[in-house]
Amino acid sequence: MSQVIRTLALTGLALAGLSGCVSVPRGQGGAAPAVVGQVSESAQQAETARQAWLQAHPAWSFQGRVAISKGRDGGSGRLDWQQDGPRYHVQLSAPVTRQSWVLTGDTTTGAGRLEGLDGGPRAGADAEQVLLEATGWTIPVNQMPDWVRALRIADAGAARVDLDEHGRPRTVQQDGWTIDFLEWTPASAAQPELPRRIEARNGDAKVRLLVDQWTLSP
């Protein structure tokens, strides 16, 4: 596997780790997950309000750093995600190799386009298939907008969700992955609380995401 494809594949693993490695249509999960945690009524109301606010503000972006490992392979890079409703524009960059790739697509249609690969861009009606052919990894990009914001967890096919004292997801178990929301960006006048540090693991695969900045349009 070339260095370009290997680095992109590892970054793809990071996205897959945060998403549970399964493509599930938005809002069409399986059985309801087991929700664990003693949460006050005020905390439940606050979390309901947080999720409602996020669903009412579909234009947002974040910049962060990702570190991943699987077996003997590992790597790190930067991730710049921009979302406008169902449309996304994601830039992946590896500072060590000074290489970057751009993924664009639409979560409604499922179509996507990947640029920055040897041989030119690749596009198709199924963004996940485009990525699979380019990297060898199945990456459920259509679920990422909800997962990185800890939004609609119950609809994403999770088997178990542990809540913290504020009613937010603390740990999510899905399809062999354990995803921990370890740190949150405090709420401000412009936006509610959002995940800052997320770690995911599945066997010898480990993923760490640190969000440096969230930006949400009013």
From Swiss-Prot:
Its membrane topology: Lipid-anchor
Keyword check for Signal: yes
InterPro entries linked to this entry: LolA/LolB/LppX, OM_lipoprot_LolB
Lipid addition sites, N-palmitoyl cysteine: 21
Bridged cysteine pairs (disulfide): none
Keywords: Cell outer membrane, Chaperone, Lipoprotein, Membrane, Palmitate, Protein transport, Signal, Transport
Subcellular location: Cell outer membrane
Lipidation (S-diacylglycerol cysteine): 21
Family per record: Belongs to the LolB family.
Assembly and binders: Monomer.
Protein name: Outer-membrane lipoprotein LolB
